[in-house]
């Protein structure tokens, strides 16, 4: 009975996510000043072989996930050969498959390496195919990638950096190549805001990553309530730093990467 109630409440909550409709707010991208400094910093310390491998895999619609090269598909656990249906009853693991596999693919973090590789190469490849963005924005059959607000937040971060790169690579300035990019990013932003995980047992890292992704969006887009969102987001981030960290910067995560993000 306890498991039944747990599954019902989880499913009810996630169904609210699935049927979310965007607000219709007009978001206008403004290329941020930070990106040139960021690009200069990372361009001098990259593994070009790894970037090239990631790029070639992407051209073949492949990506490495937890050490295994798999297809870029957003509703599969390839390790257990399991395809997720629209309704997933448990948040992470259950007896047939691991939902973290499609979560990891849906984060789209590999796109940052794809774009960096293309930026650094003298002979840039104009054959990049971002049809997967269409699949995300019309993801009726892949609702699993809307199952975790934190993972949606990470996807938004990845796509914002793709947007940043577009403005630095000459041949991708054609709007037709990325007609849905702003729509995907803004949909992710509104979804994350509506589903902040500020309560429950994942408040720590989940909530802060969601706040950080919102702050990155605010730095890249102009819209009517931008100043209000900026003030409230910075206020919440400040509160979370106070709550989650000791004076010597240790915290419950025990992660140096997480500490760097928070501070």
Model-found features: residue ranges?
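Amphipathic repeat-derived elements
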Residues: 33-50, 116-129
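Alpha-helix boundary/N-cap detector
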Residues: 3, 26-33, 37, 46-50, ...
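Surface-exposed polar/charged interaction patches
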Residues: 11-15, 44-45, 195-198
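Low-complexity, Ser/Thr/Pro/Gly-enriched N-terminal "stalk/linker" regions
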Residues: 11, 28, 33, 37, ...
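Aromatic-lined, polymer-binding surfaces characteristic
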Residues: 96-263
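Charge-rich, solvent-exposed alpha-helical interaction surfaces
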Residues: 4, 37-41, 54, 58, ...
């Amino acid at each position: 009975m306890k498991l039944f109630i747990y599954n019902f409440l989880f499913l009810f909550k996630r169904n609210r996510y699935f049927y979310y409709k965007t607000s219709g707010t007009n978001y206008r991208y403004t290329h941020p000043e930070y990106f040139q400094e960021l690009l200069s910093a990372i361009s001098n310390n990259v593994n070009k072989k790894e970037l090239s491998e990631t790029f070639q895999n992407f051209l073949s619609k492949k990506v490495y996930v937890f050490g295994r090269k798999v297809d870029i598909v957003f509703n599969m656990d390839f390790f257990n050969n399991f395809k997720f249906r629209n309704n997933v009853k448990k948040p992470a693991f259950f007896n047939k498959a691991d939902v973290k596999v499609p979560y990891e693919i849906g984060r789209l973090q590999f796109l940052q390496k794809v774009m960096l590789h293309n930026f650094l190469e003298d002979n840039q490849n104009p054959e990049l195919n971002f049809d997967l963005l269409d699949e995300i924005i019309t993801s009726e059959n892949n609702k699993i990638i809307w199952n975790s607000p934190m993972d949606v937040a990470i996807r938004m971060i990845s796509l914002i950096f793709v947007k940043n790169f577009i403005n630095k690579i000459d041949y991708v300035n054609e709007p037709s190549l990325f007609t849905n990019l702003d729509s995907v990013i803004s949909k992710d932003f509104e979804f994350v805001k509506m589903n902040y995980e500020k309560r429950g047992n994942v408040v720590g890292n989940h909530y802060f990553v969601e706040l950080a992704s919102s702050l990155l969006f605010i730095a890249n887009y102009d819209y009517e309530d931008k100043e209000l969102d900026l003030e409230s987001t910075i206020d919440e981030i400040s509160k979370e730093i106070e709550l989650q960290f000791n004076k010597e910067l240790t915290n419950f995560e025990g992660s140096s990467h997480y500490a760097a993000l928070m501070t």
